[in-house]
Amino acid sequence: MKLSVGLKVANSLSLTPQLQQAIRLLQLSSLELEQEIQIQLDSNPLLEKVEEETHESPENVKQEQQEYELSDSLNANHLPDELPVDTDWDDVYTHQSTAMERPEFEDREDNRHSEASLKEHMLGQVNLLHFSPVDKLIAYCIVDALDEKGFLAADIEEIVSSVQHLLQQMDYDIEVEEDEVLVVLKHIQRLEPIGIGARSLAECLFVQIEALATTTLFRKEALMLLKHYELLVSNDLNKLIKQTGLNAELLKSAIDLLKTLKPYPGAEFEQKESDYQIPDVMVSKKNDHWYVQLNPDILPKLRINSFYSGMIKRADQSDDNQYLRNQMLEAKNFIKSVDERHKTLLKVASCIVQHQREFLEIGAEGMKPLVLRDVAEEVELHESTVSRVTTNKFLLTPRGLFELKYFFSSHVGTTSGGEASSTAIRAKIKKLVADENPRKPLSDNTIANLLKEEGIDVARRTVAKYRESLHIPSSSDRKVLI
């Protein structure tokens, strides 16, 4: 690590609880956020939820709106000198109902008590490690980059970039190098489940074998096999015997040991896909203009509880008074983090809609090429932030409900020098096949030529790849003989 401001800065660096909370809230789905809000409501008497009232005066409505909107300007590091008058302590806290307790959610009780996710499980272990603040920040970014199978979905350079971005947010001029990330990654890979954070199946299996006791039978032979991973997956036993010097019996025993490992260590944390999703953002068309808004049904209206805040005595240093002051700071931090989450979500969703208006007008064929970097640069956020805010967040459109990540697709060149979206090309292939003569189905080469006539230059093998991803059989299998 290169320090331009000295070792003292690195030693004093701390990943503030507020920043940790803001990062975590960004990646929560709407249901997970609802659960988190309820946990905060149950544990902090200074935080309360504004309940909807059927008959409210305009003055009351305006006051409630101001209380939520002003949360962005709350200074979490300072309490006003003049607080309301002192009041007797009352430890009774009335539980506020949540959207999850409405009748329409009664059948979804399991969602409120689901097992910890993979990332939550890993963060719990990371917080127990004696990492330096910078290493802990690196670990958070590594965990954030895990996919559902437990593999590291980002390369080391991307992790470094994410860490640098967060350090800059905290105004620290510290340069993190790839070697440091690799060291932290090795620690992560040896947490439970072992092999988590691997960059390939070979590395995943290697970490698990290496973690076994040295007295484990055939451990040494299994490690030898993994050094010839390509021969192993191709099941070329003769070459394996020649390369490793193992006889057939030892080879079989080593392979049997490898079969006891977990190829996808994060799979046990995968949650079954729900048959419903709640939209986070909605888009609608009015007077030839598209409007984006957050789903009002899931927007939490939070505020500071005036009753308990009125008990805080400015000059009182008692434990009870200090407890209330701390709880007020935590409540303000939480309100601000939730508010920032929604502002970021709306900003990113609006940018995506701006790029994909043609999709809204004509469907998948109108999808434009768009990648995380495009949106990140436009809204002036880091790619990792855009990734967090588009994962498990859903946009309700006139054409259906879509995860925000659905609107990202790779670029494919066109004959005119422009670019087309891979999603749009898949849609065109699907339409061509749907309209083909079943007695003379279109070959991949014919489809490629038809796309070229539309200005989309794709190879036959690319068409085959897209066709297979759509689960469309080959032309010979589609042919109908009558």
Swiss-Prot record:
Protein name: RNA polymerase sigma-54 factor
Protein's job: Sigma factors are initiation factors that promote the attachment of RNA polymerase to specific initiation sites and are then released.
Sequence motif RPON box, location on chain: 459-467
PANTHER family linked: RNA POLYMERASE SIGMA-54 FACTOR
Gene Ontology terms, MF aspect: DNA binding; DNA-binding transcription activator activity; nucleotidyltransferase activity; sigma factor activity
Pfam families, A to Z: Sigma54_AID, Sigma54_CBD, Sigma54_DBD
Species this protein is from: Acinetobacter guillouiae
One annotated GO biological process: DNA-templated transcription initiation
UniProt gene name: rpoN
Gene3D superfamilies: Homeodomain-like (1.10.10.60), RNA polymerase sigma-54 factor, core-binding domain (1.10.10.1330)
